[in-house]
Amino acid sequence: MAKLTKRARLIREKVEVTKNYDINEAVALLKELATAKFVESVDVAVNLGVDPRKSDQNVRGATVLPHGTGREVRVAVFTQGANAEAATAAGAELVGMDELAAQVKAGEMNFDVVIASPDAMRVVGQLGQILGPRGLMPNPKTGTVTPNVAEAVKNAKAGQVRYRNDKNGIIHTTIGKVDFETAQLKENLEALLAALKKAKPAAAKGVFLKKVSISTTMGAGVAVDQSTLEDVK
């Protein structure tokens, strides 16, 4: 049997896999176990009470976390005219139409989020095979296809996270960095779960937020007792 690393041994000793932890205790555990030489992200996995095989039960959207994600986000915007000026003023790194599409086709994709005004979708639509597999294709449900591109840029810069359940009905996203204050991570998690509750499909029955686990980039998941969170019980 392969030898456990020092970190893996520590996780095995400290984390009770069957326990739901108070949110403050869960965050304290993550901080204690975050021994990587870089500032790890704090990620969340939310098991939803949906049948992902049914299109009317899939959950997709976006929300701005009150304390952001701790990441510097580079934004590309497909738009023109006054919208292009507004996007640039809002902080977008790349703004354009056909010339920006040419950069993408050439493999120059130095950005984390793509936003498009509706009139630009004729251009963006040609890039689906490039942007789609990378999770970068703009979509109205996540607020990345919008006539108000400036607001979308500001949201992306402010720490907006996008979410979409996978084939197992689980949402995976980030809620900050391990060096955030415990209260900041708690409030970010609460904001995400509140957004998910609002996005609950009408066809979904029974318990919607079935399980919530948080982890660091290199760490194991710690299940959170939802009763220790505000307004998401």
From Swiss-Prot:
Q: Which GO terms describe its biological process?
A: regulation of translation; translation
Give one GO term, molecular function aspect. Answer: rRNA binding
Identify the keywords attached in UniProt to this record, alphabetized.
Answer: Repressor, Ribonucleoprotein, Ribosomal protein, RNA-binding, rRNA-binding, Translation regulation, tRNA-binding
Does the keyword field hold Calcium? Answer: no
Q: Does the keyword rRNA-binding apply?
A: yes
Give GO cellular component annotations, separated by semicolons. Answer: cytosolic large ribosomal subunit
Record-linked InterPro entries: Ribosom_uL1_bac-type, Ribosomal_uL1, Ribosomal_uL1-like, Ribosomal_uL1/biogenesis, Ribosomal_uL1_3-a/b-sand, Ribosomal_uL1_CS
Subunit structure of this chain's protein: Part of the 50S ribosomal subunit.
Q: PANTHER family of this UniProt entry?
A: 54S RIBOSOMAL PROTEIN L1, MITOCHONDRIAL (PTHR36427), LARGE RIBOSOMAL SUBUNIT PROTEIN UL1M (PTHR36427:SF3)
Q: What does this protein do?
A: Binds directly to 23S rRNA. The L1 stalk is quite mobile in the ribosome, and is involved in E site tRNA release.
Family assignment from sequence similarity: Belongs to the universal ribosomal protein uL1 family.
Protein's name according to its UniProt entry: Large ribosomal subunit protein uL1
The record lists the organism as Shewanella piezotolerans (strain WP3 / JCM 13877)
Give the taxonomic lineage as stored in the record.
Bacteria, Pseudomonadati, Pseudomonadota, Gammaproteobacteria, Alteromonadales
The gene name reads rplA
